[in-house]
Design a protein with these regions (language model features):
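Gly-rich Lys/Arg/Thr-decorated short loops/hinges at beta-loop-alpha junctions or inter-strand turns
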Residues: 43-53, 81
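Short acidic/polar capping segments at secondary-structure boundaries
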Residues: 16-18, 43-46, 90-93
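A cross-family phosphate/adenosyl-ligand binding-site feature
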Residues: 1-9, 13, 37-46, 162-166
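Accessory alpha-helical/coil subdomains and C-terminal extensions
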Residues: 12-13, 22-24, 28-35, 55-166
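An alpha-helix initiation/capping motif
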Residues: 19-20, 39
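Acidic side chains
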Residues: 8, 16, 46-48, 63, ...
Length: 166
């Protein structure tokens, strides 16, 4: 169909799968004696395309993840001793988790807190951010987080889906 429609260039906007498939298609056509140029624009929430500093979609995903967590962390006002784990995409790359944590901290800085209603900054803050690029000493973290739980009645964790897998 590409040949019939005289398509000789494809512009892709997407992540690994989109651009890998377009490149494979171009390679297949090249092996058949046909030319296809692929121009790929990276769009990935992982923000892990080198040398691109900021991929389309990454900052928006971080901002939306922060807003989502702002709604979820409100559960800390409903009862005591809450553990909230906000799992964020990022099997091999922690950029989105770290970016989401950063955006959430910006939101947190604009809040007013009422400690009498369990709305202290300590209860809404992030107590741990785990990403694949950093080793986790689980025994130390358990002790540290238990102390936070005892002091603040809650622990809030941002977890990249690939963290601690090694």
């Amino acid at each position: 169909q590409l040949e019939k429609d005289k398509v000789d260039i494809i512009h892709t906007i997407g992540g690994d799968d989109t651009n890998t498939m377009a490149a494979a298609l171009a390679e297949y056509l090249h092996s058949s004696g046909k030319a296809l140029t692929v121009v790929g624009l990276p769009k990935t929430v992982d923000n892990d395309v080198i040398p691109v500093k900021q991929t389309l979609g990454a900052l928006t995903a971080a901002e939306q993840g922060a807003l989502f967590f702002q709604n979820i962390v409100n559960e800390n006002t409903t009862s005591r001793r809450q553990l909230i784990i906000h799992e964020v995409m990022g099997r091999h790359c922690g950029w989105l988790t770290a970016g989401t944590a950063l955006e959430y901290r910006k939101l947190l800085g604009r809040k007013n807190f009422i400690p009498e209603l369990f709305m202290s900054k300590d209860r809404w803050d992030i107590h741990a951010v785990y990403i694949p690029e950093i080793q986790i000493d689980f025994s130390k973290e358990v002790k540290r987080l238990r102390k936070i739980m005892d002091e603040h009645d809650c622990v809030n964790i941002f977890l990249s889906e690939g963290a601690g897998m090694d």
